[in-house]
Amino acid sequence: STSQLRFQSSDKKDDFRMVLPDIHPGPFHPIGGSNITALIYKKMDSTAMVMHSISNHDLNLPTQKEVQNYLNSLQESKVQQGGAVCTEPVAVTINKARAGGLLFDRTALLFLSLSPHGMEDLPPNVRSEIEQFAENRNFEQVLIVDTHNAMGKEISKEDSDDLLLAAKSTLDTLKTKQSHPFKFGFANSEDMKLIEN
């Protein structure tokens, strides 16, 4: 499945999505879904920011047929919840682990990182444990971004445990925060007519 946060202006002229596919780019260029991020971006009319969810290479789409089936399934997605409020961001650091989050109505958006230390894909148990924790605290949904912003080794048990603690602390703090109306903006460099040198 694929999770999305959809932002739409009140006049419905501006539409933007944050997309967290439950698949993994790969296995390698140009095979299968190696460029799945770009394909999702194009499928959504270049108005999407595609994030790396908690997934690993077991979730690669190995053939172009599977990639096309997946892309076609995006058209069938429905908006499950609406709202126009969010909290201020919350950030929690435990040792090398960092979690940042926002709460949109009852949907939490979490960003997990060990940056500037490197890391490989987050293990699936991190996702399932955070999702269970969020469900127990009456969140509608939790979307988890593996920021994957520094390449490195497989995540150690200690770092994984710290990421879980940071994520849970972030969720607990978000529950105490006041929500506010917000505005969003989105720019696409394709519309800027940039000149390459």
Place the predicted regions along the sequence by residue.
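Terminal domain-initiation and capping elements
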Residues: 1-197
